[in-house]
């Protein structure tokens, strides 16, 4: 294995070339697509779920690095990128909305997350809020408006699990533990916009350590209507979200 300054990512400080902002999708296959929208994209490393590229915006280096699914792997990516000099993190993902008025194809910008994860507890007690940085949130909202995307801003429920933690019954056992039975209805009543699996860890880590973080997601399904997304809709929604996160990064540099 090549020399690295960190345990998992396979990167050195020299690889970052002074970058202080990272775009962090979950999916490794999304990394190259994001980097391709910027100047001078170059692949840096790929190890397990962590694929990283470097590119430039207005002459400044930006890192794009996948986190994999869920809080534990996200915490590794964020920790090691911070060790290498990253101070601002913009997460991009896809999501399932749980409010009837949110349509497939809309964009959601997260201001804070319901901490349904476990990893964030390793960084701050449950009383500490998983809150996004104001400048990051503002940049994401402005970027979304600049491309004409229908945008909703609010709270996200961030779960360690895709099935029981998001109250899905289409599973092998068909069972959801008592803690999560009826939970989606409660989150809906509180105005929570959506479910995803990484933002609670990301936002808690960053807010508690003096780092900046923001979160944007494209809606690929509304769970009040259906559970399975359409492939073409997913592709279009991802494309919009990618453009938004790159424009937001430009505004934050």
From Swiss-Prot:
It catalyses: uridine + phosphate = alpha-D-ribose 1-phosphate + uracil. The keyword Glycosyltransferase applies. Its main location: cytoplasm. Keywords: Cytoplasm, Glycosyltransferase, Transferase. Gene3D superfamilies: Nucleoside phosphorylase domain. Pathway: Pyrimidine metabolism; UMP biosynthesis via salvage pathway; uracil from uridine (phosphorylase route): step 1/1. Its EC number is 2.4.2.3. GO terms for molecular function: uridine phosphorylase activity. It holds the Pfam family PNP_UDP_1. One of its GO terms (cellular component) is cytosol. Disulfide bonds: none annotated. The keyword Methyltransferase does not apply. InterPro entries: Nucleoside_phosphorylase_CS, Nucleoside_phosphorylase_d, Nucleoside_phosphorylase_sf, Uridine_phosphorylase. One of its GO terms (biological process) is nucleotide catabolic process. It is found in: Cytoplasm. It comes from the Bacteria. Catalyzes the reversible phosphorylytic cleavage of uridine to uracil and ribose-1-phosphate. Homohexamer. Belongs to the PNP/UDP phosphorylase family. This is Uridine phosphorylase. It comes from Salmonella typhimurium (strain LT2 / SGSC1412 / ATCC 700720). The gene is udp.
């Amino acid at each position: 294995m090549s020399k690295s300054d960190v345990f998992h990512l396979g990167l050195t400080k020299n690889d970052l070339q002074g970058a202080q902002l990272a775009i962090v999708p979950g999916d490794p296959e999304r990394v190259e697509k994001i980097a391709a929208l910027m100047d001078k994209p170059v692949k840096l490393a790929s190890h397990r779920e962590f694929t990283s590229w470097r590119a430039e915006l207005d002459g400044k280096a930006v890192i794009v690095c996948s986190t994999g699914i869920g809080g534990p792997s996200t915490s590794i990516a964020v920790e090691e990128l911070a060790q290498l000099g990253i101070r601002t993190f913009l997460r991009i993902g896809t999501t399932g909305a749980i409010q009837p008025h949110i349509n497939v194809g809309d964009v959601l910008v997260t201001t804070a997350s319901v901490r349904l994860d476990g990893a964030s507890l390793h960084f701050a007690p449950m009383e500490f809020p998983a809150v996004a940085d104001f400048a990051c949130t503002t940049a994401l909202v402005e970027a979304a408006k600049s491309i004409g995307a229908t945008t909703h801003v609010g709270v996200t429920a961030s779960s360690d699990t895709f099935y029981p933690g998001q109250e899905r019954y289409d599973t092998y056992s068909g069972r959801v533990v008592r803690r999560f039975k009826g939970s989606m209805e409660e989150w809906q009543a509180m105005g929570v916009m959506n479910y995803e699996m990484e933002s609670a860890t990301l936002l808690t880590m960053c807010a508690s350590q003096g780092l900046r973080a923001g979160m944007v997601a494209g809606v690929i399904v509304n769970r009040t209507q259906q559970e399975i997304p359409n492939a073409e809709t997913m592709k279009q929604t991802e494309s919009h979200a990618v453009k938004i996160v790159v424009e937001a990064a430009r505004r934050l540099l």
